[in-house]
Structures are given as C-alpha cells and as structure tokens.
Amino acid sequence: MKKIGINDFTFYNYPTGITASPDGKHAAIAVVNANEKDNTYDSCLWIHDTESKKTRKLTSGKKERTFIWLDNETLLFTSDREKEYAKKVKDGEDWTCFYKISIYGGEAQFAFAVPYKVTKMQLAGTKLVLGVKYDYNKPDFAHMEEEEKEEALKAWKDEKDYEVFDELPFWANGQGIVNKKRTRLAVYDMETGDAKIVSRSMTMWRLLDRGRKQGPFSFPAIIQIRRMYTRALRCIPSPRTRWRLWWSREI
C-alpha cells in the first residue's frame, strides 16, 4: 500500500456549500482545492443536475466560493475580476464585487460592488443580508475623500510594523489576529444600490444558512443572529502581579 505523502492533500477536491435551486432541479457547489505554488486555496463553482445526475464546472476564476441562488437559473456570487476595484483593495480599501451567471453557461456579468469584505450572504426579497468582516483598527478608506484617504492611509501604513492588543482573545487558530475584528451585519438594496451596516458597534453577529425569522428586519430574511461576548483583561496589583479574566457584555 502506498504511503500518504505530505503533499497528497493538494491533489484532492473539496466540495463545500452545496445549495439546491428553489425548484430543486439543480444544485450549486463550491469546489475548493489547494494551490501549493501560491500558498492559497482556489475555488470554483460547479452545477449538478438532479435529473440527469451530471455535474459540470460553471466558473474558472479560482475565487468563486460565496454564492446564492437568485432564481432557478441564475447564481449571484463574489469574485475579484474588476481591475478598478482590485486597485482600490490594493490601496487598502475593503470592497467585494458581485457577479451574476446563468447555470446554462455564458460569461458572468458584473452586478455591483459593496465597500465591505463580504463573507456570507442571504437573499431577502430585493435585499441582500451580508455578513462582513470589519476591522476597527483600520480606517474606513472607502468612505473617505481622496485627500483625507491619502493622509489616513499613510498614517495607517506607518503603524503597520506593530500591533496593539487590548482584547482577549487577540489571536485565533486559522484566523490570525482577531483583536478589534468583528463580523458585522450589513444590508444591500439591489433596487437602490444602497449598502449600510445595521448591527451595533463592536457586536459580533453570525449569519447562518438556516434559522428562524428574527432581528431588525421586516422582510423575510432567513437568518439567525447570535450576540457574542468578549473577554476583558484586568491587572490586579499584588506582590505577584496577576491577570484576571472575566466576561464583560459590550452591548
């Protein structure tokens, strides 16, 4: 029997996020595989026909992982194909681009972009409920005027050679530094193009695939919201200075 090699995991495909179309005739899947050369993971979307039992590749941009069904024949997904927004991201701004594609083929069409780093989304009528990564240590460059942004960007880069930790935990396995970083809740209106964060400051939200109707929405967003707590660190003077850890509610 051949022994398992140290690089064998790079040869496997990892299907994730399988989601059925509203009519149940198709299923979309994000297939992830390791890119050893670039030290990252590539991801493309595949379509499975539940009647013919055939599965085929739909996208090939290597960055397509987050997606939803808009109807029985159309997917909305995130990727980074727009040069204009790629430059903004390189300059320090947070943007996520969205695309539409027919499951029967053809080129994906750019739909819109939001000034947040989106990790998850759910459809709620004509609105999208978004889970976004938010870094309170980083200035909101996307909402600044050019001159203000240049000054803030310079100051931010000058401080990148050190990190300030004032929370516990400040590090998480597989995530790196998590100090002052939260998953916040945002809503994008696909009719007006308005996008805004609706969760309270410094509150951690979790957007699930399935849940009950709950939260500050009058439209039928299928979400479940979990309020998180953070731990605070306190120094207690004594002959041997110690650190005491306790739970504090931030909201």
Model-derived regions, located:
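Multi-bladed beta-propeller domains
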Residues: M1-Y14, I47-R65, V89-D94, F98-K117, ...
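Beta-strand-rich domains and repeat architectures in extracellular enzymes and scaffolds
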Residues: N7-S43, N179-K181
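Acidic/polar residues at beta-strand termini and the immediately following turn/coil
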Residues: S21, N35-E36, D49, S102, ...
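Short glycine/acidic-enriched loop and turn motifs that connect beta-strands
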Residues: N33-K37, R81-A86, Y134-K138, I223-R227
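Solenoidal tandem-repeat scaffolds enriched in leucines and small polar residues
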Residues: K138-F141, Q175-G211, G215-Y229
